[in-house]
Amino acid sequence: IRDPEMSRGLGDVYKRQLTHSSYANEKHMKKHSDNERLEFLGDAVLEIVSSEFLFINYPQKPEGELTKLRASIVCEPTLALCTKPLDLGKYLRLGRGEDHTGGRKRKSILSDALEAVIGAIYLDGGFTNAKEFVLRFIMTDIENKQLFYDSKTILQELIQGRHEQLSYELIDESGPDHDKQFTVAVLVDGERVSEGEGHTKKAAEQQAAYQALLLYRNRE
């Protein structure tokens, strides 16, 4: 992938991949100047590449399990996680309001931008280059991504198997209504095991459950 910082010199498609609708609206840009159409295209490329990868690499899994595994990889939180090595949030063109309320770290914006990048690569370099990007930055560490996606369910099954009680406790809520930050703790038999943060209680619980699973895995 070309460095997103170079997008200024790479023409319209490479500007659009990083342009959020809030920026386009604020700057009164022409119609379809944001990255939403590229996101649509990138989503389709991501689906076929991820499907082919899982079909080839997991020959023993039935259709239902493959579908669930694919969902764990292409879901919003996981795609946002995949943007970290690219530092994609740094290069996004956001409206001032979106920028000031944490838009560069918002999972929905990051995951949409990643799909837009895939769409831009497809248009510029064809399917082979887009596939290479997906395999390099997304279709890696599958087991860990599935663990992240299913963290609450997997943790629930683990704790039940140990005949212990699992609960979640909201320990902090901060920020304005449009940009809330929640901190949630995982309690096992009343003892705090891990914490997680997120812009919703559900996201914070998922992160806390994931951290708890990593702790249990390291103890094994």
Residue ranges and their predicted role:
Residues 8-220:
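Double-stranded RNA-binding/processing signature
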Residues 1-3:
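Short, exposed "boundary/linker" segments that immediately precede the start
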